[in-house]
Amino acid sequence: MKILGIETSCDDTAVSVYDSEEGLLSNVVSSQIKMHEEWGGVYPDLAAREHTKNIIPVLDRALKEASVNIKDIDGIAVTVAPGLIVSLVIGISVAKTLSWIYRKPLIPVHHIEAHIFASFITEKIDYPFIALVVSGGHTELYLIKGFEDYRYLGGTLDDAVGEAYDKVARMLGLGYPGGPVIDRLSKEGEDTVKLPRPLINDRGKNRFNFSFSGLKTAVLREIQKGVYRKEDIARSFQEAATDVLLAKTIDAMKEFNIKNVVIAGGVSANSRLREKFKEAEENHGIKAYFPPLYLCTDNGAMVAFTGYKRFKESGTTVDYSFEGKARLRMDKFVEIIRKSSVSS
């Protein structure tokens, strides 16, 4: 079975072909990072224009690299939520058009769900597991009991961790995106700046929730004092942020007696986060799964693979009236597509 995956939820135009027997046949991504650098973040209208310009060339290249004719594709998977609506509609429109012209099933995929199952492309992972989702727009914990069996545990109350990285990098004059540059700079610094770990010991209603706005504000105050080097501030911020991510995840694993954890999203590429979870494998007797670096950021491969799993395991497809959603939690998404499925 061959599935085409289309991803345009933010600022990356990505298309991939996944074959159930041969694996990934292609994975083409057109990045817009350079375009958005001057804005210090993603500018929605610019992202939409670039998607419109890039989507057909990226699609053609993905099919060419896979040595596949569109007529031989068995299904069209596309990210439908969450994301920038002006970006989502580009990919959804192309997916609907291909589905209609070539009479192929239209398979809806949730962006966060795709990030989580990206690790399944290269690893065999047993259920149940805890999923820690860390990206520019999301910081969430889920209990995953099976495919489409998702329980939301908690999320950020303000900034996502990737957003905090971007803002701290901007404060330090390091440019965009902030995650990679802070990760690199922190290797040259020392953890000498005393910074808070928000909600790290909370056992009440915010036990599995996150908050990074206070940490961000504390960093700003230290920068304004002018006492510490940029390298030390970057290192101390990274230590604080990753401490919280690790502690909350381990707490969830203990609460539900889970031994496996999947770390997903763009921030899963962070070297210190990987180091800390590696240490936790020995200290807590857990197994941590990270996607390979090329599958950490947005890509079509994760969409194609997740679309394959949906088509194979639940057969859920939608008709052309299905629309993208800017905000939609992963567990709620499953409820919606089941009600909307044309094959249920």
Swiss-Prot record:
Keywords: Acyltransferase, Cytoplasm, Iron, Metal-binding, Transferase, tRNA processing. Belongs to the KAE1 / TsaD family. Gene3D superfamilies: 3.30.420.40. Required for the formation of a threonylcarbamoyl group on adenosine at position 37 (t(6)A37) in tRNAs that read codons beginning with adenine. Is involved in the transfer of the threonylcarbamoyl moiety of threonylcarbamoyl-AMP (TC-AMP) to the N6 group of A37, together with TsaE and TsaB. TsaD likely plays a direct catalytic role in this reaction. It is found in: Cytoplasm. The gene is tsaD. GO terms for molecular function: iron ion binding; N(6)-L-threonylcarbamoyladenine synthase activity. Binds 1 Fe(2+) ion per subunit. Signal peptide: none annotated. It catalyses: L-threonylcarbamoyladenylate + adenosine(37) in tRNA = N(6)-L-threonylcarbamoyladenosine(37) in tRNA + AMP + H(+). It comes from the Bacteria. Substrate binds at residues 133-137, 166, 179, 183, 270. InterPro entries: ATPase_NBD (IPR043129), Gcp-like_dom (IPR000905), KAE1/TsaD (IPR017861), Peptidase_M22_CS (IPR017860), TsaD (IPR022450). Its cofactor is Fe(2+). Its EC number is 2.3.1.234. One of its GO terms (cellular component) is cytoplasm. GO terms for biological process: tRNA threonylcarbamoyladenosine modification. This is tRNA N6-adenosine threonylcarbamoyltransferase. Pfam families: TsaD (PF00814). Fe cation binds at residues 111, 115, 298.
